[in-house]
């Protein structure tokens, strides 16, 4: 059940079997927005089963909604020094930097990528921790107040702490991801 970016790599490395869609009659119900995608442009290797977004999880007790409404910039706000979490993976961290700077999420321009690396380095003094799954404990227990994370996971955390809220910076852009089913060749 790989994510979109890994499916593209697996196709490129000839690691997946082509699917026989005669054996997948319910594929007809897959929304057109999830067919002929950049990661599987000919719809040969994958069937999406879930999708999601990356947004900003924050604690309404401590974080000013006006700051969150500024979008990704809140993750650099010194007002929340040592209460900000950041992804511990380059894909999502660079994506946030790209959106913050107004760059295309798929940019390969070396100058733009260096600018992203630079603002991520500038962010380091205000970041409490670089995390993945640790975000659950840190946000639910109010050790941290702001974190970028996956919307579905944020909804689960919000059930555990009524002070948590989710913001999707639509004006700046956000990552949309797809996880799909595939059949490996081996």
Question: Which residues are covered by each model-predicted region?
Answer:
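Hinge/capping helix and adjacent helix->loop/strand transition within the periplasmic-binding protein
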Residues: 61-85
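Ligand-binding "clamshell"
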Residues: 11-18, 40-44, 156-168
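Short helix-loop capping/hinge motifs at secondary-structure junctions, enriched
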Residues: 61-70, 102-109, 186
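Solvent-exposed coil/turn segments that connect beta secondary-structure elements
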Residues: 4-6, 24, 60-62, 80, ...
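A bilobed periplasmic-binding-protein/Venus flytrap-type ligand-binding module shared by bacterial periplasmic
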Residues: 55-62, 99-100, 177-186
């Amino acid at each position: 059940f790989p994510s979109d970016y890994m499916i593209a790599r697996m196709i490129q490395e000839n690691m997946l079997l082509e699917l026989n869609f005669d054996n997948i009659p319910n594929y007809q119900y897959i929304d057109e927005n999830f067919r002929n995608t950049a990661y599987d442009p000919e719809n040969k290797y994958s069937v999406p089963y879930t999708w999601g977004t990356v947004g900003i999880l924050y604690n309404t007790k401590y974080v000013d909604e006006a700051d969150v409404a500024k979008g990704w910039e809140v993750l650099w706000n010194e007002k929340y020094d040592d209460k900000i979490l950041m992804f511990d993976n380059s894909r999502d961290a660079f994506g946030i930097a790209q959106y913050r700077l107004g760059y295309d999420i798929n940019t390969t321009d070396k100058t733009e990528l260096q600018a992203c690396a630079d603002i991520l380095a500038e962010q380091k003094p205000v970041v409490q921790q670089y995390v993945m799954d640790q975000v659950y404990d840190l946000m639910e227990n109010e050790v941290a107040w702001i974190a970028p994370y996956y919307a579905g996971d944020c909804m689960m955390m919000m059930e555990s702490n009524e002070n948590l809220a989710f913001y999707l910076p639509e004006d700046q852009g956000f990552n949309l991801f797809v996880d799909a089913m595939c059949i490996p060749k081996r």
